[in-house]
Amino acid sequence: MTLLQFAGLLLVWLVCGGFILTLTWREFRRVRFNFNVFFSMLFLLTFFFGFPLTCILVFGFDVEVVPAEYLLQALLSAGCFYAIYYVTYKTRLRTRHRAPSRPAFTINRIEAHLSWMIMALVALITVSVFFLHNGFLLFKLQKYSQIFSADVSGVALKRFFYFFIPAMLVVYFLQQNMRSWLLFLVGTVAFGLLTYAIVGGTRANIIIAFALFLFIGIIRGWITLWMLALAGVGAIVAMFWLALKRYNLDVSGSQAFYTFLYLTRDTFSPWENLGLLLQNYDRIDFQGLAPVWRDFYVFIPSWLWHERPSVVLNSANYFTWEVLDNHSGLAISPTLIGSLVVMGGALFIMLGAVMVGLIIKWFDWLYEKGRQEENPYKAAILQSFCFGAVFNMIVLAREGLDAFVSRVVFFCVIFAACVLVAKLLYWLLDSAGLVRARKGPACARSSLKHCFVGNDS
């Protein structure tokens, strides 16, 4: 990369990044938090945060990167994608004021508590089973890629570990105070560190728990933007340290700074992967929507589908194996835009931007329903569902649309199943006469139906 090419890339980076940052800041000042703000920050992080790191690697360590023309295409495609996304998100699809609709479901106090207990049990039981089969993989494996080898059993169980976080979110939303907020941080980060050691270096649960803690603090006004910035720097350093442990790296001096730059870029902002994909554009055989349904294969156990393909050719694996001919054992993240290019080229970038705008719009609608819900138990369930889907949005920005669709469907099914089981258990308890009246001063001040645990709302 020459200085002239760097100057051109810097100009485009400033214009596109400034455009997205301005819109995000305006939205933040208006609402403090919604999923448009969150996705916009993720988008900035994924496609723009890595540019300065790449430049330092190029000019400070003489690292060879993707040719500048493809990096330029990556920045321009990110800017165009966000513009289409933002217009879609802001387009009103129906009138603002509508007559109140009949609630689709109700939740009482016992059902809410049973729901979070079941989700926590799902996570704890699957972690325990995985541990009994494999032990602490962090101290047993020589390379991180060995996590995906045949020597590790019960890999499918990892997808259930995450449900500890929405369980703790329900606990927080049932009693929204600073004590519950701090307990959420301690509980979820401790669980994340446990899964980090057991699985062998997976940091997702730690990152998500800390991010949710910060966003809740911003919403409630318990932390300021300066505190958020300092926490972000601390999180980057912590993720770097965990990455060193994951890859068994021992570095110092300038080598440590170099390692910090490329690991931080690859962890938070794999934007160069999009440039690399665009560089190999002529080698792509467009996959259509096939990567979306192929990604569901990982959720089907082999004992249920004996002929299940051993290789799941989603957009990340197609990019890694077929386009780059890389068989190192780890898939290279194509990013959201890259996955759309794999599916259908430039046309799919525009269609994908519209679809993502509608997805984020739906999550914001559901989140607002949860905030306005008068029943505190139903509100806790709705808001924990929305915040629990944060992991899926990180997958959307980093891994692509196909990975997002399969994971969000899985999350919805398991979350809904936990709530349905909770309602069934409550019905059985109520039928057995085990639901007793709540006695105390509150009963004297409320209607008869609210004195019963089962009808508390």
From Swiss-Prot:
It is a multi-pass membrane protein. GO terms for cellular component: plasma membrane. The chain crosses the membrane at residues 3-23, 41-61, 65-85, 118-138, 154-174, 181-201, 206-226, 227-247, 340-360, 377-397, 408-428. One of its GO terms (biological process) is enterobacterial common antigen biosynthetic process. It is found in: Cell inner membrane. It comes from the Bacteria. Keywords: Cell inner membrane, Cell membrane, Membrane, Transmembrane, Transmembrane helix. Probably part of a complex composed of WzxE, WzyE and WzzE. Probably involved in the polymerization of enterobacterial common antigen (ECA) trisaccharide repeat units. Belongs to the WzyE family. This is Probable ECA polymerase. It comes from Erwinia tasmaniensis (strain DSM 17950 / CFBP 7177 / CIP 109463 / NCPPB 4357 / Et1/99). The lineage of its organism: Bacteria, Pseudomonadati, Pseudomonadota, Gammaproteobacteria, Enterobacterales.
